[in-house]
Amino acid sequence: MKKALLALFMVVSIAALAACGAGNDNQSKDNAKDGDLWASIKKKGVLTVGTEGTYEPFTYHDKDTDKLTGYDVEVITEVAKRLGLKVDFKETQWDSMFAGLNSKRFDVVANQVGKTDREDKYDFSDKYTTSRAVVVTKKDNNDIKSEADVKGKTSAQSLTSNYNKLATNAGAKVEGVEGMAQALQMIQQGRVDMTYNDKLAVLNYLKTSGNKNVKIAFETGEPQSTYFTFRKGSGEVVDQVNKALKEMKEDGTLSKISKKWFGEDVSK
């Protein structure tokens, strides 16, 4: 009986070790693939970029030409150009963006991504935008004037965004949406009280849309920077993108693009 048990134990142990070895082999293969990512990108001559295409003025379609444009689109296109690459944009809803990156549908995300709570999972470029969060309400809403008024109110947010965390931390009840456009629509319909979003995006919306039905109730939080975002292990690709960004900062190109879209340099 003891011999039978010992034999069974040895079989199980060997199987477990084999499984661990296979897991390590698979992990090594995955790391090798990511390590070869830059070589693969160079060979294809194409940088594949995930972006929303619905987040004006960062990534959206021009109303007249339907061409994908925006600050993020222009910056990453210039980065690729300096690296001798073309850009292939893959438009994706925000809440599916990181799943697309993880599944290697694209090499990088260009969509105003913050680092908070993501640094353990992803690699990031140097920053290329700095802004603050604002809270938007209906024009005639006089109940929300500061962070202290948010608790118990309903805020429309993309569930995987940092703005969702700001709303939740302030005590708001969150209604999930696909982006800022839907959030603003729900505010005007009276279905939610507010939304947290980027100051630059909201100012641009108010300027270009002429919408008088919503307003910025207040600014909140510390200045937030945004970064191009990569899978972990994309080291050489990140280095190359940072090299191009550094050149763009030094020769004034990044500042020029920033002033074109916002009237000031928001890249610092």
Curated annotation (Swiss-Prot):
Keywords per UniProt: Amino-acid transport, Cell membrane, Lipoprotein, Membrane, Palmitate, Signal, Transport
Lipidation (N-palmitoyl cysteine): 20
Compartment(s): Cell membrane
Family the entry assigns: Belongs to the bacterial solute-binding protein 3 family.
PANTHER family hit by this protein: ABC TRANSPORTER EXTRACELLULAR-BINDING PROTEIN YCKB-RELATED, MEMBRANE-BOUND LYTIC MUREIN TRANSGLYCOSYLASE F
InterPro entries the record matches: SBP_3_CS, Solute-binding_3/MltF_N
Primary site of residence: membrane
Function, as annotated: Part of the ABC transporter complex TcyABC involved in L-cystine import.
Signal sequence annotation: 1-19
Lipid attachment residues per UniProt (S-diacylglycerol cysteine): 20
PROSITE patterns, sorted: PROKAR_LIPOPROTEIN, SBP_BACTERIAL_3
Name used for this protein in its record: L-cystine-binding protein TcyA
Disulfide bond positions: none
